[in-house]
């Protein structure tokens, strides 16, 4: 945000330099990102003087050029070749002398040099308005007041303004500081803390009066929730023209281009007081009535930029009896604005609902100075005041007459809010005690009203324009920023408490697992958390009512927050597959979002998605396709790398997978993985087999919290391996056999592995054969055959009892 130093001095007569003022504003929380020197005319018109045309004859070799003699006050007239049709003897004109730097339309500099034009020497240049950047006319040279003396500096004639412009990095909560008035309020409070007491000077409305009541326009507000306050007044017999130089300079200094006096005044009030205004051509208001209302969905409306827009049923509009004229608080319409022929206006000043304006602006892709302020919340109680200040300026600058009483529709006043400020809490949060009188002085300087003072604190009323100050902590922050962060002493003692609970740093675990997956040939992806609701029509597992929906989605593809990481992964896979990248292994860390009747939840996940071959063809080895068991191995290696074991395996029972497995520990789901349903894959035009794993990362991290690293000696005594084959039912899983075996012999059985699976001939229907290997070891002695046989017998008994297994 740009703030003019000269403009600030209209409110508060500071004697500090711009640099000192910038430092103070930064200390107050209005960070100055830069200070730039500003001159209202490029180059400051240096080298431009008033000249007196003594002679003007036809150029001997050019029909459209004149040869002139011009007195520039130094005693020796200059010969200047001029192409302007209006140059004549006796005129006073601006002359750019040799060595003067001028600027082209793109502000690029060029220098006046002595030279010849069609054989005749030219010792300078007689200038037009646009060549000096003080106007837009290029019809001819400027003709000045005949009373001016030759040699007078042209900058003195025009009135150049030199200024310094602050670039403020305004935080979103400081809506009250989005104007010169707002910044001046803070500056005054800061100066007061530095022992400088200055008056805050605000524009007076004492001269406001109604000239006549000949142009009454009725106002009706149909939606007071979206337009809590609406004011207006009519002004007639005004003349739309260029603004005076001082007003143009004010706007130029903050980067605005002057348009005409009426529009310039509304922009001036916006940046001076923070109140957006809008001027309607009164002759274009049908029915003599302004109606503030919403319109049916799909109503067409053409804005000032010539774009036809379809309105939403929630867009608040300013209408007459026949048509919409303006999107409230955002942008005007093409058919109701002020033009050069306008002689009467209806001037609007309002307070619109910030949320409504923000939604409308986003919906239509519009971002204006007005919407920027309305979205953040302006002062609802200066609406009429700002309107009156603007009306007075319309009288003085545009020659208008105030032709109606001010209409002010404000059915429910937005009240100031009250807070009790505790001295004890203030000292506790700041870290030291600030004198009570200093606290009261700071509050008063911030226009916070003191209602009552007790031994324990102060009862205060906070003005409505400070919508960011609603709690005691907010008030304490205000006191601290004005008192000065730099004045708070650093304590010589640092007190801290240390948690005894083992802390798992998520990012470190993610980094470890990400490195492991990268080593396995995976690539990390990062998908948008917003996704298309239509994806969820292909599964009954993820219910539409559990989706967190966006109130104002940018497109159909971004209308809900994802419940699953799957669909983003499939989008990425399909994108790559369409570019002939066939062997794909991807992973992503992210969050899913879930809507429940009484709350919303976020959960962390790690997703893996695999398609194609796990290896490529080489001269030594052919490529190998990925498989369910390849993905299972990746999942198990991740869990093993994290030190997680003892999980239980079971079948996935949802329609996301055509075949899949759940891994649980202590009845908490760690991961689910398997082959993605063809119905879902087909929606993304993927024909190959897709493998997907979904780690419930919150649960994985929770398991890590309880894991302790144990260090053991290298065993001195040998391991013993024994095998046997079991005849089992088809539904029995190896993981369940392994878990049962380890629970049967907890001390000596170190490892159980599956080394052969057989199904087919010579086996009963519904049966399969598993060949298992058992590693047995005693760390304190060598095992005897008798001890080993006893262990194997116990294992056989467990398998027979729990799984109905028989030895083959």
What is each of the regions a protein language model found here?
Residues 118-131, 137-143, 154-164, 291, ...:
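Mobile "lid/hinge" segments at catalytic clefts and subdomain interfaces of large enzymes
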Residues 187, 191-221, 398-426, 432-433, ...:
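Terminal amphipathic helices with adjacent charged low-complexity linkers/tails
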Residues 1-211, 346, 365, 369, ...:
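Phosphate-backbone binding interfaces of nucleic-acid-interacting proteins
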Residues 419-423, 427-582, 775-777, 787-808:
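Extended, well-folded interaction surfaces typified by the phenylalanyl-tRNA synthetase beta subunit core
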Residues 5, 23, 27-28, 40, ...:
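Glycine/proline-enriched, intrinsically flexible loops and inter-domain linkers
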Residues 49-79, 260, 266-335:
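Conserved mixed alpha/beta core segments that line enzyme active sites in large multi-domain catalysts
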């Amino acid at each position: 945000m740009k703030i003019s130093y000269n403009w600030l001095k209209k409110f508060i007569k500071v004697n500090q330099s711009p640099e000192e003022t910038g430092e103070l504003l930064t200390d107050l929380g209005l960070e100055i990102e830069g200070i730039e020197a500003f001159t209202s005319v490029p180059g400051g018109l240096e080298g431009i003087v008033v000249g007196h045309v003594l002679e003007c004859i036809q150029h001997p070799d050019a029909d459209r050029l004149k040869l002139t003699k011009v007195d520039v006050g130094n005693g020796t007239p200059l010969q200047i070749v001029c192409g302007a049709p209006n140059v004549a003897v006796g005129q006073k004109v601006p002359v750019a002398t040799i060595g003067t730097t001028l600027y082209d339309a793109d502000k690029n500099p060029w220098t006046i040099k002595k030279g010849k034009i069609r054989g005749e020497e030219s010792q300078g240049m007689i200038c037009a308005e646009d060549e000096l950047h003080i106007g837009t006319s290029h019809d001819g040279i400027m003709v000045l007041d005949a009373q001016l003396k030759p040699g007078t500096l042209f900058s003195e004639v025009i009135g150049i303004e030199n200024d310094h412009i602050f670039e403020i990095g305004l935080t979103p909560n400081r809506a009250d500081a989005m104007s010169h008035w707002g910044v001046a309020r803070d500056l005054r409070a800061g100066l007061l803390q530095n022992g400088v007491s200055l008056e805050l000077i605000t524009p007076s409305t004492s001269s406001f009066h109604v000239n006549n009541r000949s142009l009454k326009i009725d106002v009706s507000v149909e939606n007071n929730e979206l337009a809590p306050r609406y004011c207006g007044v009519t002004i007639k017999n005004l003349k739309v023209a260029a603004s005076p130089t001082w007003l143009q300079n004010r706007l130029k200094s903050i980067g605005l281009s002057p348009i005409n006096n009426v529009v310039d005044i509304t922009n001036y009030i916006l940046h001076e007081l923070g109140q957006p205004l809008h001027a309607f051509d009164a002759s274009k208001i049908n029915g003599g009535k302004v109606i503030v209302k919403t319109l049916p969905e799909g109503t067409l409306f053409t804005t000032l930029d010539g774009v036809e827009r379809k309105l939403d049923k929630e867009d608040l509009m300013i209408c007459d009896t026949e048509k919409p004229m303006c999107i409230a608080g955002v942008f005007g319409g093409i058919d109701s604005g002020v033009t050069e022929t306008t002689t009467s206006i209806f001037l609007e000043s309002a307070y619109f609902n910030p949320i409504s304006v923000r939604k409308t602006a986003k919906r239509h892709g519009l971002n204006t100075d007005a919407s920027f302020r309305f979205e953040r919340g302006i002062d609802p109680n200066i609406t009429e005041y700002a309107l009156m200040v603007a009306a007075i300026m319309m009288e003085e600058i545009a020659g208008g007459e105030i032709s109606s009483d001010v209409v002010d529709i404000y059915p429910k006043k937005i009240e100031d809010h009250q807070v009790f400020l505790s001295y004890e809490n203030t000292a506790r949060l700041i870290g030291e005690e600030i004198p009570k009188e200093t606290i009261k002085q700071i509050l008063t300087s911030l226009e916070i009203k003191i209602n009552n003072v007790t031994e324990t604190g102060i009862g205060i009323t906070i003005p409505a324009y400070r919508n960011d100050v609603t709690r005691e902590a907010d008030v304490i922050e205000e006191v601290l920023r004005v008192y000065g962060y730099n004045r708070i002493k650093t304590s010589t003692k640092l007190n801290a408490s240390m948690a005894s609970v083992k802390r798992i740093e998520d990012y470190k675990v993610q980094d470890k697992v990400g490195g492991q997956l990268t080593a396995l040939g995976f690539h990390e992806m990062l998908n948008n958390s917003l996704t298309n609701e239509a994806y969820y029509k292909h599964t009954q597992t993820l219910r539409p009512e559990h989706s967190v929906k966006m109130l104002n989605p940018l497109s159909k593809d971004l209308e809900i927050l994802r419940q699953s990481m799957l669909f983003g992964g499939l989008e990425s896979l399909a994108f790559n597959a369409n570019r002939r990248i066939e062997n794909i292994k991807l992973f992503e860390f992210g969050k899913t979002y879930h809507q429940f009747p009484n709350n919303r939840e976020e959960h962390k996940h790690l997703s893996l998605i695999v398609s194609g071959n796990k290896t490529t063809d080489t001269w030594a080895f052919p490529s190998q396709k990925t498989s369910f068991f390849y993905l299972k191995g990746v999942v198990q290696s991740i869990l093993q790398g994290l030190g997680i074991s003892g999980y239980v395996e079971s079948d996935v029972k949802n329609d996301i997978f055509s075949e899949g497995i759940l891994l649980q520990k202590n009845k908490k789901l760690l991961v689910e993985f398997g082959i993605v349903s063809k119905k879902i894959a087909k929606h993304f035009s993927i024909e190959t087999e897709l493998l997907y794993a979904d780690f419930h990362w919150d649960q994985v991290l929770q398991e890590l919290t309880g894991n302790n690293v144990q260090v053991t000696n290298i065993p001195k005594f040998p391991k013993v391996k024994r095998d046997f084959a079991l005849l089992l039912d088809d539904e029995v899983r190896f993981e369940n056999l392994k878990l049962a075996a380890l629970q049967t012999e907890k001390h000596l059985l170190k490892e159980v592995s599956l080394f052969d699976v057989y199904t087919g001939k010579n086996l009963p229907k519904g049966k399969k054969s598993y060949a298992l290997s058992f590693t047995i070891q005693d760390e304190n002695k060598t095992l005897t055959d008798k001890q080993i046989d006893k262990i194997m017998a116990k294992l056989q008994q467990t398998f027979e009892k729990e799984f109905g297994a028989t030895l083959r």
